Amino acid sequence: MLKKYLPLLLLCAAPAFAKPVLTVYTYDSFAADWGPGPAVKKAFEADCNCELKLVALEDGVSLLNRLRMEGKNSKADVVLGLDNNLLEAATQTKLFAKSGVANEAVKVPGGWKNDTFVPFDYGYFAFVYDKSKLKNPPKSLKELVESDQKWRVIYQDPRTSTPGLGLLLWMRKVYGDNAPQAWQKLAAKTVTVTKGWSEAYGLFLKGESDLVLSYTTSPAYHIIEEKKDNYAAANFSEGHYLQVEVAARTVASKQPELAEKFLKFMVSPAFQNAIPTGNWMYPVADVALPAGFESLAKPATTLEFTPQQVAAQRQAWISEWQRAVSR
């Protein structure tokens, strides 16, 4: 009789022995085979006795848009890939819980004070070009926009992409209220505006543009992985806009303790060592940078709006951009 019911008993008991699943929403290049995602997944799963499930979306702004749409019904335990420019907008959703991670655990330019969002890397937006093809790159954002040179440019949409939003804010920092006219001039040189970074950079590598919006650290990938030194980031005299990428756990998480454990793991060497040669950004912890990073130019001037300024103006500036580029 016992034999008859044994399979049923085992079936009923199976969920009790199943590993908990931590669902992390992130952007596509983080979760890609060539991104830091696989190494992070392996390291965390070895430590947590759980399954780490990475759900990839196109880019950082898309993460916030998705979470807003899902609200408290979201399956995300952690959202990884928002940034300093989305902090206030993300806070206003009331969909994120306090991290449990001390601010002293991270090191970013200007310091960090936030008990909800935890940085995992940082970098500076820049336009990347191929030195073998473009001999005289622009030396400033104004030169890129205003020069008679017929440079072909690709950048990302500020409505879906954090680099795209970064360029929107960079243009505002440099041009102020004259940004609409600057956008119109840049539109004449723009090949396309993509939803996310991966698509834009892929098109650039295929020769579709002379310059692509990316990061000052992007050339490190080509130096280290491909042994090529022909890619460079144009150093702009006005300075470069800072991006600090962050993660946070959700209020709706069914695994709050595991989510907090992940955020603490995120600032540990096991995670941070995957950042320089996985996400090609600067780590927020004291880990050694690989050879190749020392040749990268660091901006003399760092540009940044406060999260509150961005939240107050973002929609108006996006509308301004839309009107300007559609003329």
Swiss-Prot record:
Disruption phenotype: Insertions in thiBPQ cause a defect in the transport of both thiamine and TPP. It comes from the Bacteria. GO terms for molecular function: thiamine binding; thiamine pyrophosphate binding. Induction: Expression is repressed by thiamine. GO terms for cellular component: outer membrane-bounded periplasmic space. It is found in: Periplasm. One of its GO terms (biological process) is transmembrane transport. The keyword Signal applies. Thiamine binds at residues 59-60, 161-162, 197, 215-218. Keywords: Periplasm, Signal, Transport. NCBIfam families: sfuA, thiB. Part of the ABC transporter complex ThiBPQ involved in thiamine import. Is also involved in thiamine pyrophosphate transport. Belongs to the bacterial solute-binding protein 1 family. The complex is composed of two ATP-binding proteins (ThiQ), two transmembrane proteins (ThiP) and a solute-binding protein (ThiB). This is Thiamine-binding periplasmic protein.
